[in-house]
Amino acid sequence: PEEVLLAKQIIKHHRWASMAKFTRGGGEANALAIRIARSNTKNKNVAFCGYHGWHDWYLSANINSKKNLDQHLMSGLNYDGIPKNLKNTSFPFPYNDFEYLEKLIHKRNIGIIKMEVMRNLKPENNFLKKVRKICNDKKIILIFDECTSGYRENMGGIHLKFKIFPDMAIFGKALGSGYAINAIIGKRKIMKKAENTFI
């Protein structure tokens, strides 16, 4: 019952969402979100911005170049143990560089965009609005990783302050006040696909 109560409370804070799932850690939540998103689209490639954990989908970006993740919080991450066939499935893009992202979407057939709403930089030149629009236009699933930013400055995700709403969002850290809990929320039509895969 506590899980249901918490899910209802988080959804109450995020009216655009209608379903929630829970994990223990942020890396697990990120991997789960990617799996659910990929089950919703034929275009499995991911464009991302920011730090999103240690799972294969994320670290595979460094197969092309060990410097790919250098601008995403942690540099010099080794991809040993990551299957080489994951090469060219996840691609980083710089925050606030919409032109770069737009080219990446066309070049790499991107089906999912996963990003931190903000970390040490604020969005400029309607960056978040442009990202949301291109996701709408290209039928790309937009995931906001709010493990770090959620429930710190406001009651919910920091994306609420900008009035830009994703298809899925992830929360952790402040959500549990020190306890190991993360939440993935999303639109019903997307989250329902979790029932068709093993989670």
Model-derived regions: residue spans:
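Conserved N-terminal phosphate-binding loop of PLP-dependent enzymes in the Aspartate aminotransferase
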Residues: 1-199
